[in-house]
Amino acid sequence: MFSTTLINTFSLGLLAVVSVVAAPGGISVGPISIGPGGISLGPGGISIGPGGINLGPGGGPGAINAGPAAVNLGTAGNYAILAKSGISTVPESIISGNIGVSPISTTAFTGFSETLDSTGKFATSQQVVGELFAASFAAPTPTTLTTAVSDMQTAFNDATGRVTPDFTNLGGGELGGLVLTPGLYKWTGAVSVNSTGVTIAGTPLDHFIFQIPATLGFAAASRVTLVGGIPASNIVWAATSVVTAGAGSHIEGVVLAKTAVTLETGATMNGRILAQTFVALQSATVIG
């Protein structure tokens, strides 16, 4: 147990006054305190405690945020699948979350056997644990979808417009067998994941952005595996061409696609598909 003691040290020149306090809660040296909770440097600064390292008020306890700043999906993040020209399914697919199409009508849903709600604002389907929205539904659905599509396009432009990548043309575009760490990744051509799969390693605070100016393909039976606690929502695949997930493959993350996305038979995804053209599911699963 510390006794309460105050020591003041005065010096001239560039050095300021330093106060050392030994008290029951620990030791305090000016803005620095050492106590049962760890080490803290000033309000909102650096703290080292039982949970790990917190760098500044935005970092949160437990880790240092690594990688680029998050991509803000806006209201597009309210959808497991959002597309501008249609969403199709070869039954039975399973979708957990809302799906939406805009600026087109409900005819853009294919294979869902949807039932319009009595309000006229949304529809339901046995293949969707959530609601289906189309631009032809009753207000406020059209306006809500217009905003969501705009937010989707803004998110795509943000993700593809980031500069100063941490990694350029990694693996020559083949990610199979690699373990990826947080950062901004940029390629000048197509990207693929072979059947070996790829591992993405990071904490719950880390972020990944993959800039792909061509096609993105996941081979049949390939897997994206997450380790370290990073959530799928912190991973963005931004592709300017077609995205294809082969039969039995598994994807983690948010797919921001300039064109179409296809999930082949038995493919699964934990994340969101936000496509500026079409999404096709072939007895696939999307958990949004």
From Swiss-Prot:
A motif (Ice-binding site motif (T-A/G-X-T/N) 1) lies at residues 75-78. A motif (Ice-binding site motif (T-A/G-X-T/N) 3) lies at residues 196-199. InterPro entries: Ice-bd_prot (IPR021884). Pfam families: Ice_binding. One of its GO terms (cellular component) is extracellular region. Belongs to the ice-binding protein family. Binds ice crystals and most probably inhibits their growth in order to prevent cell damage from extracellular ice. This is Ice-binding protein. A motif (Ice-binding site motif (T-A/G-X-T/N) 2) lies at residues 154-157. The record marks 110, 192, 265, 280 as: Ice-binding. Glycans are attached at residue 194. It is found in: Secreted. Keywords: Glycoprotein, Secreted, Signal. Its main location: secreted. A motif (Ice-binding site motif (T-A/G-X-T/N) 4) lies at residues 265-268. Residues 1-22 form the signal peptide. It comes from the Eukaryota.
